[in-house]
Amino acid sequence: MALAALLGILHRGQVEIRTAQLPFTLGGQRFAAGSYVVVLRQPYAAFAKTLLEPQHYPDLRVSPGGPPTPPYDVTAHTLPLLMGVAAVPAPDSLRLPLSAPVEPPGATPGYPGFGEGQAPRIGLYRSYDASMDEGWTRWVFDTWKVPYQPLVDSVVRAGKLKEQFDAILLPDQEPRQLLDGLPKSYPAPYPGGLGSEGARALRQFVEDGGTLIALNQASRFVMDQLLLPVRNVLEGVPDDDFYAPGSIFRLDVDTAHAVAKGTPAHNIAWFENGPAFEVVDSTAVRVIARYPADPDKVLASGWVLHPERVAGRAALLEVHLGSGRVILFGFRPQYRGQSIATYPLLFNSLQLR
């Protein structure tokens, strides 16, 4: 599915895609006949090159010897990394017979375990203080045929959530917005957020055996409100001491964990204003993925200031609480419907029993 999606994006951008007609070797790797090839001698080569290669930013400074000039917006859009597809640059000297331009293959999105009669009962929290990430999550779920029910503040605050759901997902949203929601000047039922009553109901849901999943900044809300034995090492750190305005980081993954089933030991994470975790009580917490211990290996594409702040830190955790569990993501595994490489981490989390 990921390969078809990547090729489809290139094709919609009018990039010519060809296939190798014979097996070939490149960079010590053997590629079969039929492998897809994008030749950069074509009108839309720059578009293809921009999407296929990692982004490396120049070292721009405010003044000679001064602090770096941070980028304005997100800094990475390397589709092979985001989608988990191998893309290998070839030298100009490579010569091999190629097909005429081809159409990308078709593929139907779907993931095992979400079929009728086997899918968990999923509640997707929908704040009245609208979250863009919640919209992207709905789009991903609808596209990949993941069944879910929208979950609003009043339903959460009413409690007895385990009677209705097996898993509840909180998309990326600032803790203040989750807790307080919209101001009281709005008409009912829109004012207020989850509040302390909703936080208590979520904790009870987990203690009763449910799975609560929090993405990116929502993890900070869950850590604080459910009093989890986890600390965010980036809490209170100013932008001039750590900054990553939307970058692709490398992940080292514990593939023995059920959340990481079917994923590679080395994956990626879309990092944007997320937490990085330190475990306070290891008897209740299991690290599923962490950033590389070497600061120079944290960044895969984009820009980061002081990567040593997150080097070796946990990026994905399971916290046991009562009869259930909390899954904390320090990144966005379904980032804008692009990061197919980390979809399985989210989908597997929803299916934990």
Language model feature labels by segment:
Residues 1-296, 300-353:
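Intrinsic-disorder/low-complexity accessory segments
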